[in-house]
Amino acid sequence: MRVGVLAIQGSVREHIEKLKLIDGVEAVLAKDKNTLLSLDALIIPGGESTAIGKMIVDFGLKDAILKLNERKIPIWGTCAGMILMAKYIVNDDKVHLGIMDISVKRNAYGSQLDSFKTKLIIPAVSNNEIEAVFIRAPYIENVGNGVRILAKHQGKIVAAQQDNLLATSFHPELTDDLSFYKYFLRLNS
């Protein structure tokens, strides 16, 4: 299975390293339209959502990502990637991809200094607790019909799925746990 990580900015290397640990996965740096369109799944990493969103347009990648979604190819956004996928961003008129029926609040957990780790119980993903790293993290304020809430932290939605789309506020690539990767890859079957 060819799994790409949108290689514009952010935690690209960390996602690639995790994907390399999973049997049957070819980890691909996705930097251009042709590479994107050849993928079986795509991860949009954390980083700076405004910068990544601008570069997606400037590099001509937006249409390719939208085509992947039309083809129901699994797409997973972590942190900034979740913001890019959201149909609505609280207090911001700018929508980047707008492919997932969620409303996201940017930097909802505060500044870099407010970053934290916690353990989450997410039965759909793992029978074990999952370590979650939140860095200037957003959360999901509202979900539309057809969006499944996978996890909450302190009453706030931090992981959700809508058909082929997966979004997490936190960074699984910064832990040793591959549970979320394996869950994501099952969306392809």
From Swiss-Prot:
EC number(s) given by UniProt: 4.3.3.6, 3.5.1.2
The organism of origin for this protein: Thermoanaerobacter pseudethanolicus (strain ATCC 33223 / 39E) (Clostridium thermohydrosulfuricum)
Function noted in UniProt: Catalyzes the hydrolysis of glutamine to glutamate and ammonia as part of the biosynthesis of pyridoxal 5'-phosphate. The resulting ammonia molecule is channeled to the active site of PdxS.
Catalytic activity, reaction form: aldehydo-D-ribose 5-phosphate + D-glyceraldehyde 3-phosphate + L-glutamine = pyridoxal 5'-phosphate + L-glutamate + phosphate + 3 H2O + H(+); L-glutamine + H2O = L-glutamate + NH4(+)
Assembly, per entry: In the presence of PdxS, forms a dodecamer of heterodimers. Only shows activity in the heterodimer.
UniProt keyword list: Glutamine amidotransferase, Hydrolase, Lyase, Pyridoxal phosphate
Official protein name in the record: Pyridoxal 5'-phosphate synthase subunit PdxT
InterPro entries for the chain: Class_I_gatase-like (IPR029062), PdxT/SNO (IPR002161), PdxT/SNO_CS (IPR021196)
Family: Belongs to the glutaminase PdxT/SNO family.
Positions bound to L-glutamine: 47-49, 106, 135-136
Domain of life: Bacteria
PANTHER family: PYRIDOXAL 5'-PHOSPHATE SYNTHASE SUBUNIT SNO, PYRIDOXAL 5'-PHOSPHATE SYNTHASE SUBUNIT SNO1-RELATED
Gene Ontology BP annotations: glutamine catabolic process; pyridoxal phosphate biosynthetic process; pyridoxine metabolic process
Molecular-function annotations in GO: glutaminase activity; pyridoxal 5'-phosphate synthase (glutamine hydrolysing) activity
Active site (record annotation): 79 (nucleophile), 171 (charge relay system), 173 (charge relay system)
Recorded GO CC terms: cytosol; glutaminase complex
Pathway(s) served: Cofactor biosynthesis; pyridoxal 5'-phosphate biosynthesis
